[in-house]
Regions:
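Short edge beta-strand/loop segments characteristic of extracellular beta-sandwich folds
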Residues: 57, 69-76, 176-184, 192-197
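Extracellular Ig-like/FN3 beta-sandwich strand-entry sites
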Residues: 65, 117-121, 174, 239-241
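Aromatic sugar-binding surface patches on proteins
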Residues: 102-111, 223-234
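Edge beta-strands of extracellular beta-sandwich domains
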Residues: 134-140, 252-263
């Protein structure tokens, strides 16, 4: 499927997902999170949940467990975030992604699509510029997302692998950028629908997005990021070109550059 068709599909999906994202589905008690908290955030202290600093929207019940939209936002004037961990408690690899964020992304508005493998809390833990941590999250009803069949398999899945598209549209005095990367992002839990053989894990492990020399976003990801990764990010544009560098678990490297206008 060409990237242009993917873009149209995402636009339709985003419109359809809007009402669901507003559902009241707060975090639930999670023994899995209690066990992993220290390893993930470096402390046993539970970060406070404070919507005045950080919020996370996700559907109460996922239409497609392999393509669950997550949006992480801050209100105007909220303190800047330097690092962010996205955790899906009940996934085989719970840490879906870790982000490093540049000053131009404040206040944060970040969207990503993930796989959810079982009914689970989906949480974001932000580290602020002053070192404090704050958390936001939702409970999502979904199952089987990490093992859901890939859209394509075999060599067909790798056709145009690493192709990227970047678009940017004005959003008030800021801009909303969207990055799409062609990649199967195999989770290691899927099967080839023709051969019925297990497909080894093969996914985008890092993405670095810059505006000129300034960092916008760096992501270290795992198997929970959906096939053909898509990231939407609010930022303050300065007219400089946007460059992207990505690497996957097969040591492939992908690079692209786009004009500051977002073409």
């Amino acid at each position: 499927m060409p990237l242009s068709q993917i873009a149209r599909w995402i636009a339709v999906a985003a419109l359809g997902a809007g009402p669901a994202l507003a559902a009241d589905n707060p975090l639930q008690p999670s023994p899995a999170w209690d066990e992993m908290r220290l390893a993930v955030i470096g402390t046993e202290t539970e970060p406070p949940v404070d919507p005045a600093v950080l919020d996370l929207d996700a559907p109460m019940r996922a239409d497609n467990p392999a393509l669950v939209p997550i949006r992480i936002t801050q209100p105007p004037g909220a303190p800047a975030i330097t690092r962010l961990a996205l955790v899906i408690d009940e996934n085989p690899a719970p840490v879906a992604a870790e982000f490093t964020l540049g000053p131009a992304t404040a206040p944060l508005d970040l969207e990503v699509r993930v796989r959810v493998n079982a009914y689970s809390d989906v949480r974001a833990i932000a580290t602020l510029a002053d070192g404090r941590q704050v958390m936001a999250g939702r409970f999502v009803k979904a199952s089987g997302g990490c093992a859901a069949p890939a859209g394509r398999s075999g060599e067909d899945a790798r056709k145009d692998i690493g192709a990227m598209r970047w678009t940017s549209e004005p959003a008030g005095d800021r801009a909303m950028g969207q990055l799409m990367i062609r990649h199967p992002n195999f989770s290691g839990l899927q099967r080839d629908q023709l051969t019925l053989l297990d497909i080894p894990a093969e996914f985008v492990r890092s993405v670095t997005l810059r505006q000129g020399d300034a960092l916008l976003m760096e992501m270290e990801g795992g198997i929970s990021i959906s096939e053909n990764p898509v990231f939407r990010l609010g930022y303050t544009p300065d007219g400089a070109p946007v460059t992207i560098h990505a690497e996957d678990t097969e040591d492939r490297q992908f690079d692209a550059s786009f004009p500051g206008s977002g073409g």
